Swiss-Prot record:
It comes from Histophilus somni (strain 129Pt) (Haemophilus somnus). This is Small ribosomal subunit protein bS6. It comes from the Bacteria. Residues 116-125 have a biased composition (Acidic residues). The gene is rpsF. Keywords: Ribonucleoprotein, Ribosomal protein, RNA-binding, rRNA-binding. The lineage of its organism: Bacteria, Pseudomonadati, Pseudomonadota, Gammaproteobacteria, Pasteurellales. Pfam families: Ribosomal_S6. One of its GO terms (molecular function) is structural constituent of ribosome. Residues 104-113 have a biased composition (Basic and acidic residues).
Length: 125
């Protein structure tokens, strides 16, 4: 089985359907004997340019190890699902399990806000 990185963008009005979509896609990969190495829901993000007059989309990243049949099935599912605005499936040489730069940046920002809030409370006293 080969390793793949899959990113798909969902219509922002369909964001509540994303967990169900992820569940369907991961279950089809696991049923075929594949593995999910990394799954990240990046949430709703600003697009670089409008797609179908939309300025935001819900992003999901998956790194998987799966047979080609499952990847073909996912491509077909993405193509005929109107909620999926764009998708990309890239074959990789190795399994990628570490957090993506998007998640790392988000985690680095969280402690800063906590420190800033503590400094603000100290200033009031």
């Amino acid at each position: 089985m080969r390793h793949y990185e899959i990113v798909f963008m969902v219509h922002p009005d369909q964001s509540e359907q994303v967990p169900g979509m992820i569940e369907r896609y991961t279950s089809s990969i696991k049923e075929a004997g594949g593995q999910i190495h990394r799954l990240e829901d990046w949430g709703r993000r600003q697009l670089a340019y409008p797609i179908n007059k939309l300025h935001k989309a819900h992003y999901v990243l998956m790194n998987v190890e799966a047979p080609q049949e499952v990847i073909d099935e996912l491509e077909t599912t993405f193509r005929y699902n109107d909620a999926v605005l764009r998708n990309v499936i890239i074959r990789t040489k190795h399994a990628v399990t570490e957090a993506s730069p998007m998640v790392k940046a988000r985690e680095e920002r969280k402690p800063l806000t906590e420190v800033e809030n503590n400094d603000f409370e100290d200033a009031e006293e």
